[in-house]
């Protein structure tokens, strides 16, 4: 890990801790932007579940729209917006390639989830058309009956994705739109640079 990458990661960690201890309702909420095989972009909010020097991890159904996007076009952008921080909020952008996390990591995280969340992962055919709420409720009841009295295993089609950073951008809001921006970016040889940007 290069010094500048370590600096960017440490900066994120400090800001994330600040957001977790602030008035933010959900500091781990991040916008995930992907593109499908035709290059059509899509964005949605997901929750950050872990981060370290290897990257930023979230979990999903692998056959969801985002899962299909990431398996056919394994690049993504993340956006954290913490409005309650500092003078006028802080925004962090992270861009990078995407990898599936190991089965062991996915198993460990799935086992830590509330039981009803585990059941929901089995019952939901994420991103597919649903005829009615009653249909979903019936699927939930069926899964509950199937696993009654025993642990709920991780579905084969459910797992984690890791965004491996190739760029970080930190935006510090200020009055009169006189913001401060810093960008860390890796080149093709994985050499990191740091520069200040006009707001």
Curated annotation (Swiss-Prot):
Cofactor binding, note field: Binds 1 FMN per subunit.
Keywords: Flavoprotein, FMN, Oxidoreductase, Pyridoxine biosynthesis
Highest taxon of the lineage: Bacteria
Pfam families listed in its UniProt record: PNP_phzG_C, PNPOx_N
InterPro entries with a match to the protein in the record: Pyridox_Oxase, Pyridox_Oxase_CS, Pyridox_Oxase_N, Pyridoxamine_oxidase_dimer_C, Split_barrel_FMN-bd
Disulfide bonds: none
Cofactors required: FMN
Protein's GO biological process: pyridoxine biosynthetic process
UniProt: substrate binding residues: 49, 109, 113, 117, 177-179
One term of GO molecular function: pyridoxamine phosphate oxidase activity
Pathway membership, UniProt: Cofactor metabolism; pyridoxal 5'-phosphate salvage; pyridoxal 5'-phosphate from pyridoxamine 5'-phosphate: step 1/1; Cofactor metabolism; pyridoxal 5'-phosphate salvage; pyridoxal 5'-phosphate from pyridoxine 5'-phosphate: step 1/1
Positions bound to FMN: 44-49, 59-60, 66, 91, 126-127, 171, 181
Keyword Flavoprotein in annotation: yes
Catalytic activity: pyridoxamine 5'-phosphate + O2 + H2O = pyridoxal 5'-phosphate + H2O2 + NH4(+); pyridoxine 5'-phosphate + O2 = pyridoxal 5'-phosphate + H2O2
NCBIfam families associated with the record: pdxH, PRK05679.1
Protein family: Belongs to the pyridoxamine 5'-phosphate oxidase family.
Function comment: Catalyzes the oxidation of either pyridoxine 5'-phosphate (PNP) or pyridoxamine 5'-phosphate (PMP) into pyridoxal 5'-phosphate (PLP).
Protein name: Pyridoxine/pyridoxamine 5'-phosphate oxidase
Organism: Xanthomonas oryzae pv. oryzae (strain KACC10331 / KXO85)
């Amino acid at each position: 890990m290069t010094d500048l990458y370590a600096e960017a990661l440490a900066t994120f960690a400090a800001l994330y801790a600040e957001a977790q201890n602030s008035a933010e309702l959900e500091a781990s909420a991040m916008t995930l932007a992907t593109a499908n095989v035709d290059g059509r972009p899509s964005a949605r909010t997901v929750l950050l579940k872990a981060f370290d020097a290897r990257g930023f991890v979230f979990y999903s159904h692998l056959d969801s729209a985002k899962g299909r996007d990431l398996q056919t076009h394994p690049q993504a952008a993340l956006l954290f917006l913490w409005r309650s921080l500092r003078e006028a909020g802080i925004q962090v952008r992270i861009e990078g390639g995407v990898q599936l996390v190991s089965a062991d990591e996915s198993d460990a995280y799935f086992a830590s989830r509330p039981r009803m969340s585990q059941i929901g992962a089995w019952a939901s055919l994420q991103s597919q058309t649903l005829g009615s709420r009653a249909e979903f409720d019936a699927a939930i009841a069926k899964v509950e009956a199937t696993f009654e009295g025993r642990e709920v295993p991780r579905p084969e089609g459910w797992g984690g994705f890791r965004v491996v950073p190739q760029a970080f951008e930190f935006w510090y809001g200020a009055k009169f739109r006189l913001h401060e921006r810093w960008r860390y970016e890796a080149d093709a040889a994985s050499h990191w640079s740091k520069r200040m940007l006009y707001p």
